Amino acid sequence: MKRPTQMRQPTQLEIQPILQALNTGNLELAESKAKKMLKQFPNAFVVHNLYGNALAGQNKFKDAVAAFRKALAIDPSVAELHFNVGILLNNLNRADEAIASYKKTVSLKPSFTDAHYNLGAALQAQGKFEQAANSYKKAIELEPGFFEALVNLGVVLQERSLLSEAIEVYERALLIEKDAKVYFNMGTALKNEGRLGDAVESYNNALELKPDYAEVYSNMGEVLRDQGRYDESVGLYKKALECDPTLPVANYSLAVYLYDSGDLEGALEHFQKSQFADWQERSLYCLYKTSKFEEFKQGLDELKAKNHNSPFLATLTGHYAENFGTENNYNFCPNPMDFVFHTEVPELKGDSELLQQLLKDIRDAHVEEKMQGRLVNGVQSSGNLFKRSEASFRELGECVKRVIQRYKDNFSDENCTYVKQFPKEFEFASSWFVKMNQGGHLNSHIHEEGWVSGALYLSLPTDKKHEHEGSIEVSTHGDDYPKKHDNFPAKAIAPTIGDIVMFPSCLFHRTIPFTSDEERICVAFDLKPM
């Protein structure tokens, strides 16, 4: 049998004009010459590669990918070429294909540091934070001083709520290079851990490097607010707005401060400037609380028509309808009292090791107090408790997730938006402990940022003058909303240790004061869609 004839490959002399055109930046000429040569040498790896480089240099990414893939069809073992294809695909927003190319690169050449990094970045952009972290860790193993990989690893660890690990990685990165953004990220992680003083220090380090860093002033203002340093926090919000008058979060944070301190006119101005998060609902709140009912009703109807799943809007709509005797036609959660759920957490009942460990960790954990204007004779933790490193807090978070499934199952037949659009994937927007002493109570409020909220009870007063001392009370009225009558329903629930009470975040709730010289400890949380 006759042997197949191997097609001739171009010589170095023949490809030299293409190389010269590329090296001198004459990309159009290089493209033209390579395209012409491919007619003569259609199976020449080197010519397809040069053609791809000429196209890529002109930002003809789609055609460049096709050219490189033809080269790889001839020789698929060239890791660098798979890497180049990955970069081009990423530029074309073809993320899955880019990830496949980077994975092929590192399988062919495990020591290719930049490929591990790019793979991590592509996975991070898709929200695949655990996989991204693994890729960044491989890049750092190969190059321990890879600053960008360390920074991004810190970010994805923070996204996964691994705050202590993220802080350690940021500290490693800062040993390599002092960077304002890294100090900012670390400050945010420290704040979420409840380490408010350390967060302030990190933010100040960021400002030393970048004195006009508006976001840092705004975030540090929030930390000082949590520490009860209200005048200083306002000064920082204003400093942020000097640096960037349009910064949404600074306008919003200043508005929240004014809102909480009773300056509703000032709050309204800054909410409307911010156009951030739930600014429209909070603007309506300001109008309602100042009895501007006509303006409120007009804005309410406009917002109801376009936003069908807002818990805060449900509070405002429901209260207005009940207050003025009109129909509540907002179907998010028109009857929130029906969705109160009182049950046990089995892991906290009886002689519970978890309960004892939680009480110990609450006593010993390095968590700073968050000032809470509605709380009387008590302290509230700062940060996000379920995101801390202590095993007991994380285990309690898992217990809550199991109860949430029971909660969903219990109300699965209901037809309102609150149930029908209950988040399939969720996160704990916040979680904290509250310790109260004699006379302790929490005034009526809602949780504006949550979908569903709850409280678990770890220690309760037993020496009561009446059965509902220390109980939680839920109602469709509270927070000193304007009231035209006294017919709003209310219900008191007396939990026992190891119980959990869950309810829509849009429902008013408060703690009834207790008189005994005992301690009441609960862990509260807000759940929101991811």
Where are these regions (language model features)?
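Conserved alpha-helical positions within TPR/SEL1-like repeat arrays
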Residues: 19, 23, 46-57, 80-91, ...
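Alpha-helical protein-protein interaction scaffolds
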Residues: 219, 225-228, 240-323
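Non-heme Fe(II)/2-oxoglutarate
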Residues: 326-420, 441
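Catalytic core of non-heme Fe(II) oxygenases with the double-stranded beta-helix
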Residues: 391-394, 398-401, 405-502, 512-530
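Structural marker of alpha-solenoid helical repeat scaffolds
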Residues: 40, 74, 108, 142, ...
